[in-house]
Amino acid sequence: MMEWRDEGALLSVRRHGESSAIIEVFTAAHGRHAGVVRGGASRKIAPILQPGAQLDLTWKARLDEHMGAFTVEPLRSRTALLGDRLGLAGLNAICAMLHVTLPEREPHSTLWQESMALLDALDRPGWPPAYLRWEMRLLEETGFGLDLTRCAVTGSREDLAFVSPKTGRAVSRGAAGGWADRLFPLPLALLGQGPASAEEVRQGLAITGHFLGRELAPLLNGRPMPEARARLMELLARA
């Protein structure tokens, strides 16, 4: 018998049979993991199984490769976000992006900590810049981090103003020349220079979205990025 105990956030839930549910969670030590919750559709347990909920999880299976079953205890509910359209959109985007980005059962402890901190921040104003930084971390976890430290053409660290949509590397204003309109504008927020304006967050998310879409293309099989992320971008564009 295989067994472990861990803490995780619920990414998704679907009914299984008459009274059970299959949940997917992102855990601290075991990564993205699915399992059955017996009685998960019951009046007692179903209210606990809400996306974003932080859970104390015990997983058991006869063999490691089996789906196995979870027992769950609530640690933190995030149902308060149900009344906050932007916060709820952020939560749904986080859950959807973790689902499509992470391989099953592969630990990502730093990303887990940062994801929990971001989920905790969603009920406070001013969290979109943190979401942008989180997507940059997500890019790094896919193996494709942006290189914004120096100009890809000249090697200079000064006057970095653009990002190449091909390489993800910074380009200085002088080196861009006539190619500037084919490059992404580089918001100072991505360089960690000063507070991020709403426009800079939108510019930054256009960059991370471009590269996440490209890197995730084999997993998406021609499908677009998760609708939950598109919904968040739509709301941020109106803000």
UniProtKB/Swiss-Prot annotation:
Any one Gene Ontology biological process term? double-strand break repair
User: Which keywords are on file for this protein?
Assistant: DNA damage, DNA recombination, DNA repair
* Pfam families in UniProt: RecO_C, RecO_N
Q: Which GO terms describe its cellular component?
A: bacterial nucleoid
The superkingdom of the source organism is Bacteria
Q: Which SUPFAM superfamilies match?
A: ArfGap/RecO-like zinc finger, Nucleic acid-binding proteins
Function according to Swiss-Prot or TrEMBL: Involved in DNA repair and RecF pathway recombination.
Question: What does the sequence similarity comment in the record state about its family?
Answer: Belongs to the RecO family.
Q: What is this protein called?
A: DNA repair protein RecO
